[in-house]
């Protein structure tokens, strides 16, 4: 049976349909907004796998290029490995949905959102999250939703729900928010140095609209008559749990007071082994032994949270708002164009900057067409950074997500391309990690950019905030959380910015939402922490280096008429190749007539720029030029005085004395000085070597 409902979501009319397509999925909805058509489907296994002790959720967002009437690129002409922007939207769907499944529900769930028809004006991220929530809400799969997503922009101080792709270009805020009817559950985005108050205002605006779409989903589920599956939870052995707590509580409490991550992990491991060995004497059932390991983890969770909430004590002895010790190194590597090492506690990031030219732009394909990026930040998280052994492979979703967050934090303080025409790549190598490595990447990246001579608007620092709360409403906000506090806490909120304001943010929860009072505390405490970090960073470097590294390319930019680009390129690229061969410089020509000239040194770049100028310079009568003899005739020599512009130096104008043969004085390939005597209406140029010699 087909069910349809429609409703207004800001300026958009949303139509939801189910019961016609993908009927064998456990939940499926066709979601429409304008010409945008999404298909969201979800399926779940009937039972958890034997021994499963975590929730295996997979969220996949896919853009089909047929949705805009285009073929995929490449040899096979079909969609292949998901590009970075699809992975990022997949994460936007995953992160707010994951904590809303019942605790202890370990059945495998696969959620897919596909773009079947695209609308160039419609930004997809918020709609994709909405479609995913609808599919789950109308399915029989247990889910403590619905939630809704909203993308928020701001133009001239006015907040906009779900801005168009054109509007977002002019917005000083790009925020994606997910929430329930009453609480925010996820935020992500970037801003042009917005204040805490402006950010909170945008979140309140989003929450109001989110509640509207949540209500629509509730009405839809009621119309369909959804009946959810019963959650099958494993029975707990209360008696065994009490015995484990009695034996292990003091031991785990002592082990948790160790501030060093490596030592602490070893001590916790030793306690766990001791407890298991002790109970093996009286417990023979292998499943009960597995339960003991689960109870030990729960006990550790209880100990860490009790210390923070009731004693105001963190495992490493810090105050709730205290930041770990910070150290900074500037340009520790001699080869790269700029580098830094930022260490905060046991988290360490090596930031490295490479400056490139237009040909180094990253090109990628989206539903809107081919795009280019001139700034990129790549985040690497090797196994050794956490003392583990695992196979090295390409970047996973986590690395891509962390790199994107750090990239957005730094992107908005970069100079305009007119001021600094370089392509910039920042790499963050995580050398060791104990929480907040993405924010360490922001700090090391900011330092390395200044060290490389990139004139950024100001230093950028990032901090990760945590939250511990209980059912009574009591809560504690933690600054600069370590890995343990991230693992056992309720929130991981990353905020990056300058002294003027916030540039990037990301918040994930393990609870069903936080109030605005809590968010206000988080933002205020994060700002104090950010300023503290900036104070330390700016003691080491507070402005861009005065000069670029010797190995960095030297770039000169020229702008030429768009309708004359072909003249510069020449037949088959002849002119551009000629300039490169003569000067050693490279030319990158854009469709708007912008020409980026890069050389290994300033002389090379200037020589090439002079040649480019020559293509578009007008020949001046009376001016002396240095030109190359291109051809010799009986009556004179043809000399190229500007690229593509030849004139005739008649035999009578070659020398002061009588010349019997032109070849007696000049040869092909010679560089000679000539004076322009005349340019006629047809463009013929009359040259004189003799007149030029007279003026030496």
From Swiss-Prot:
Cellular localisation: Cytoplasm
Every S1 motif domain range: 622-690
Alphabetical list of InterPro entries matching this protein: ExoRNase_PH_dom1, ExoRNase_PH_dom2, ExoRNase_PH_dom2_sf, KH_dom, KH_dom_type_1, KH_dom_type_1_sf, NA-bd_OB-fold, PNPase
Major subcellular site: cytoplasm
Keywords recorded for this protein, A-Z: Cytoplasm, Magnesium, Metal-binding, Nucleotidyltransferase, RNA-binding, Transferase
Cofactors named for this entry: Mg(2+)
Catalysed transformations (reactions): RNA(n+1) + phosphate = RNA(n) + a ribonucleoside 5'-diphosphate
A GO molecular function held by the record: magnesium ion binding
GO cellular component: cytosol
Top-rank EC class of the record's enzyme: transferase
Positions bound to Mg(2+): 486, 492
Cited CDD domains: KH-I_PNPase, RNase_PH_PNPase_1, RNase_PH_PNPase_2, S1_PNPase
Enzyme Commission (EC) number: 2.7.7.8
Function comment: Involved in mRNA degradation. Catalyzes the phosphorolysis of single-stranded polyribonucleotides processively in the 3'- to 5'-direction.
Official protein name in the record: Polyribonucleotide nucleotidyltransferase
Organism: Leptospira borgpetersenii serovar Hardjo-bovis (strain L550)
Originating gene: pnp
């Amino acid at each position: 049976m087909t069910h349809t409902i429609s409703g207004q979501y800001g300026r958009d009319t949303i139509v939801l349909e189910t019961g016609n397509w993908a009927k064998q999925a456990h939940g499926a909805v066709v979601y429409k907004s304008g010409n945008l058509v999404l298909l969201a489907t979800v399926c779940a296994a009937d039972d958890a796998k034997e021994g499963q002790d975590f929730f295996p959720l997979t969220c996949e967002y896919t853009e089909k290029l047929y949705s805009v009437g285009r073929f995929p690129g490449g040899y096979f002409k079909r969609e292949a490995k998901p590009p970075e922007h699809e992975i990022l939207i997949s994460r936007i769907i995953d992160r707010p949905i994951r904590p809303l499944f019942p605790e202890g529900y370990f059945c495998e769930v696969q959620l897919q959102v596909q773009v079947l028809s695209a609308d160039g004006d419609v930004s997809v991220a918020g709609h994709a999250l909405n479609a995913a929530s609808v599919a789950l809400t109308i399915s029989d799969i247990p889910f403590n939703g619905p939630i809704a997503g909203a993308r928020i922009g701001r133009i001239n101080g006015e907040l906009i729900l779900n801005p168009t792709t054109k509007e977002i270009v002019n917005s000083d805020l790009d925020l994606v928010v997910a929430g329930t009817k009453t609480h925010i559950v996820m935020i992500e985005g970037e801003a042009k140095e917005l204040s805490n108050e402006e950010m909170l205002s945008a979140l309140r605006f989003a929450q109001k609209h989110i509640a509207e779409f949540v209500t629509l989903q509730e009405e839809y589920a009621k119309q369909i008559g959804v009946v959810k599956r019963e959650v099958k939870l494993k029975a707990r052995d209360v008696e065994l749990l009490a015995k484990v707590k009695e034996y292990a509580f003091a031991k785990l409490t002592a082990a948790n007071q160790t501030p060093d991550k490596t030592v602490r992990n070893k001590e916790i491991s030793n306690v766990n082994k001791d407890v298991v060995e002790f109970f093996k004497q009286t417990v023979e059932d292998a499943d009960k032994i597995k339960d003991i390991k689960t109870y030990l983890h729960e006990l550790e969770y209880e100990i860490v949270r009790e210390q923070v909430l009731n004693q105001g004590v963190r495992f490493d002895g810090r105050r709730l708002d205290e930041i770990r010790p910070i150290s900074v190194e500037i340009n520790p590597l001699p080869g790269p164009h700029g580098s830094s090492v930022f260490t905060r506690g046991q988290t360490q990031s090596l930031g490295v900057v490479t400056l490139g030219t237009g040909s180094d732009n990253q090109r990628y394909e989206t539903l809107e067409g081919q795009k280019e990026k001139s700034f990129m930040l790549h985040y690497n998280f090797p196994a050794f950074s956490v003392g583990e052994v695992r196979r090295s492979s390409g970047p996973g979703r986590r690395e891509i997500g962390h790199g994107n967050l750090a990239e957005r934090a730094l992107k908005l303080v970069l100079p305009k391309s007119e001021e600094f025409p370089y392509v910039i790549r920042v790499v963050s190598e995580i050398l060791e990690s104990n929480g907040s490595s993405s924010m360490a990447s922001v700090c090391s990246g900011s330092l390395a950019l200044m060290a490389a001579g990139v004139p950024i608007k100001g230093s950028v620092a990032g901090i990760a905030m945590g939250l511990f709360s209980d059912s009574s409403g009591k809560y504690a906000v933690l600054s600069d959380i370590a890995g343990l506090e991230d693992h056992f806490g309720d929130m991981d909120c990353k905020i990056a910015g300058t002294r003027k304001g916030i540039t990037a943010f990301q918040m994930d929860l393990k609870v069903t939402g936080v109030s605005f009072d809590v968010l206000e505390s988080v933002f205020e405490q994060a700002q104090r922490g950010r300023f503290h970090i900036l104070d330390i960073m700016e003691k080491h470097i507070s402005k861009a280096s005065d000069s670029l590294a010797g190995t960095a390319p030297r770039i000169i930019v020229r702008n030429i008429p768009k309708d004359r680009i072909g003249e510069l390129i020449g037949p088959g690229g002849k002119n551009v190749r000629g300039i490169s061969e003569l000067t050693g410089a490279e030319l990158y020509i854009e469709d708007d007539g912008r020409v980026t000239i890069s050389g290994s040194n300033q002389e090379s770049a200037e020589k090439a720029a002079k040649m480019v100028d020559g293509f578009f310079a007008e020949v001046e009568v009376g001016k002396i030029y240095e030109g190359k003899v291109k051809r010799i005739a009986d009556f004179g020599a043809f000399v190229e005085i500007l690229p593509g512009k030849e004139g005739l130096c008649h035999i009578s104008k070659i020398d002061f004395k009588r010349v019997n043969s032109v070849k007696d004085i000049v040869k092909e390939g010679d560089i000679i000085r000539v004076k322009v005597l005349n340019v006629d209406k047809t463009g013929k140029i009359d040259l004189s070597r003799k007149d030029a010699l007279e003026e030496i």
